[in-house]
């Protein structure tokens, strides 16, 4: 809807000065025409002649149920508790975490498998995204930001047990359970603060975007989302775009450079690209899925 009353393309701004250290925070929220994402531009400013600390985590609440699972990047194999006091394998926990015995091997990316209040934060990732997905409705939410500035990737839940259910009753009449999808800037853990020098300003951008039918995301930008799964010698390719994108080449190759599949297509939130490719005896880790524009520029892989 491009009507002026909707304000698409306008920047909705808010700012505040916190009372203890007089640090100023400013945020601008923008919905762009024909783009299925929310852009957030942030600035923090130290108004004093003294070094100050700050801690920044964006924190949307996400509805969850037995079909929900967190979507962490494929290079996240372990997660930390607050203050890095405890650590667990991820997504399959195999030990004690939050005093819960997962030694049989439990997928803690799934909300239904976490019985007690639990936080987990990714340990190192070179990817720019984190999010979650509901299998039964085939839809989810992603956060995208430069991982050099925004390394924090976290999920918090009250837990899918008696204690969590009691909190659901206290917090909502009808909406049911939720998780907090938390994204840290200049920090990958809590409470891990960052410094602002006297009169220093820091700024960054964050994006939140809905997506559908992609499943367990393997890579993403604000413009494209990729998934590549392999089962029974077949590669399942899914590509989602947050806006209309024409003449996009989808290419699947192996690590030797041999092209196994390529196709030029038009993408949009309504036109999700899906394909299946026979890969014979290829190992999944030897496959590379790439997107190129019509000039041959690599967009994502």
Where are these regions (language model features)?
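Single conserved hydrophobic/aromatic residue that forms the stacking wall/gate
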Residues: 1-12
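Short, hydrophobic/aromatic-enriched beta-strand segments in well-ordered soluble domains
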Residues: 14-17, 42-44, 200-213, 292
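A contiguous, surface-exposed recognition patch within enzymatic or periplasmic domains that forms
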Residues: 36, 47-55, 59-201, 209
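Asparagine-centered strand-capping/turn motif at beta-strand->loop junctions
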Residues: 43-48, 239-241
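Surface beta-strand/loop "capping" patches
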Residues: 214-245
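Beta-strand-rich binding/interaction modules
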Residues: 234-263, 287-288
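Short, aromatic- and glycine-rich surface loops/edge beta-strands on solvent-exposed regions
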Residues: 250, 281-296
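Edge beta-strands of extracellular beta-sandwich domains
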Residues: 263-264, 296-301
């Amino acid at each position: 809807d491009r009507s002026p009353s909707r304000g698409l393309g306008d920047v909705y701004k808010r700012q505040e000065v916190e009372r203890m250290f007089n640090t100023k925070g400013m945020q601008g929220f923008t919905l762009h025409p024909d783009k299925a994402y929310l852009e957030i531009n942030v600035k923090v400013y130290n108004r004093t002649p003294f070094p100050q600390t700050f801690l920044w985590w964006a924190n949307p609440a996400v509805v969850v149920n037995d079909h929900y699972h967190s979507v962490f990047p494929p290079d996240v194999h372990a997660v930390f508790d607050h203050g890095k006091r405890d650590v667990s394998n991820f997504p399959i926990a195999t030990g004690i975490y939050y005093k819960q015995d997962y030694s049989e091997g439990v997928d803690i990316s799934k909300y239904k498998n976490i019985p007690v209040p639990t936080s987990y934060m990714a340990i190192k990732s070179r990817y720019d995204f984190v999010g979650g997905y509901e299998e039964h409705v085939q839809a989810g939410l992603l956060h995208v930001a430069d991982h050099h500035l925004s390394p924090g990737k976290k999920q918090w839940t009250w837990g899918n047990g008696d204690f969590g259910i009691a909190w659901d009753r206290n917090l909502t009449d009808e909406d049911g359970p939720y998780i907090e999808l938390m994204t840290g800037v200049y920090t990958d853990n809590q409470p891990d603060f960052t410094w602002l020098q006297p009169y220093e300003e820091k700024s960054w951008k964050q994006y939140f975007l809905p997506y559908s039918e992609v499943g367990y995301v393997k890579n993403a930008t604000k413009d494209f989302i990729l998934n590549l799964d392999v089962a029974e010698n077949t590669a399942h390719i899914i590509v989602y775009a947050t806006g209309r994108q024409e003449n996009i080449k989808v290419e699947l190759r192996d690590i030797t450079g041999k092209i196994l599949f390529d196709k030029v297509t038009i993408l949009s939130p309504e036109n999700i690209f899906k394909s299946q490719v026979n890969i014979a005896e290829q190992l999944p880790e030897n496959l590379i899925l790439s997107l190129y524009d019509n000039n041959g520029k690599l967009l994502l892989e």
